[in-house]
């Protein structure tokens, strides 16, 4: 590991990152070759090493940036929705959870798994995703805090672990491999609402009896 960080030209650095991302889009994470990135960016491989130390260093930045964009795009969508709503039903709130049928999000969902798998062998990427995940978990708690006052009174008392633990960890890794026994989004939301509402009503009744 170099003892001194190489700053270099920000424009060149961004060009290398852009070309690396294009390579990953075309050939996947495993197919990323520094020689191809260098050719596209019209720089030398040794220069890439100066900026990113090695292939893992380049991957850590490119995939870390992608993961951050993925997380914050989702957060911005939810924040905007919560802020714009004066009242929220439990059914509407449940729509924000990950769903079995990813639709247009399927590609991102699959790529996210690849990024997480890469992070297991890439300490720099692992540290960045860990920090983003800790921040996202804290954000999810504040999002719940903002939603609860807008729900009907009897639906406000659910066990928060439905969202902070179960749904936070839901990725449908094995579900996507099934050919049968699949559930559509409407059925899933109905099932989720039933569980959360039952929890809320049980806690609500216990506090008022």
Report each predicted region and the residues it spans:
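Amphipathic alpha-helical packing segments from all-alpha helical-bundle domains
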Residues: 71-72, 102-113, 123-149, 190-193
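Short, basic, alpha-helical segments at the C-terminal edge of helix-turn-helix-like DNA-binding modules
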Residues: 34, 64-71
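Hydrophobic/aromatic-rich alpha-helical bundle segments in the mid-to-C-terminal region
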Residues: 126-130, 147-209
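Short loop-to-helix capping motifs
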Residues: 54, 118-123
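N-terminal intrinsically disordered/low-complexity leader segments
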Residues: 1-11, 204-209
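Solvent-exposed, amphipathic alpha-helical segments
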Residues: 15, 19-26, 72-80, 111-115, ...
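Hydrophobic alpha-helical connector segments
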Residues: 61, 74-109, 160-165, 189
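Helix-turn-helix
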Residues: 12-15, 19-57, 61
């Amino acid at each position: 590991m170099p003892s001194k960080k190489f700053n270099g030209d920000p424009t060149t650095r961004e060009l290398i990152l852009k070309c690396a991302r294009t390579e990953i889009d075309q050939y996947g994470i495993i197919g990323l070759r520094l020689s191809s990135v260098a050719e596209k960016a019209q720089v030398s491989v040794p220069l890439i090493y100066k900026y990113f130390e090695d292939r893992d260093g380049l991957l850590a930045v490119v995939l870390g940036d992608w993961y951050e964009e993925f997380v914050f795009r989702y957060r911005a969508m939810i924040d905007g929705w919560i802020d714009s709503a004066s009242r929220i039903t439990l059914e509407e709130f449940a729509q924000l959870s990950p769903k079995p049928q990813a639709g247009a999000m399927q590609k991102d969902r699959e790529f996210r798994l690849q990024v997480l798998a890469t992070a297991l062998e890439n300490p720099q990427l692992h540290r960045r995703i860990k920090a983003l995940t800790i921040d996202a978990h804290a954000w999810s708690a504040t999002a719940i805090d903002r939603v609860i006052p807008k729900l009907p009174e009897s639906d406000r008392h659910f066990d928060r672990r439905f969202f902070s633990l179960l749904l936070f960890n839901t990725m449908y890794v094995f579900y996507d491999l099934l050919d049968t026994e699949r559930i559509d989004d409407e059925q899933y939301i109905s099932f989720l609402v039933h569980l959360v509402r039952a929890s809320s009503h049980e806690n609500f009744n216990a506090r008022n009896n």
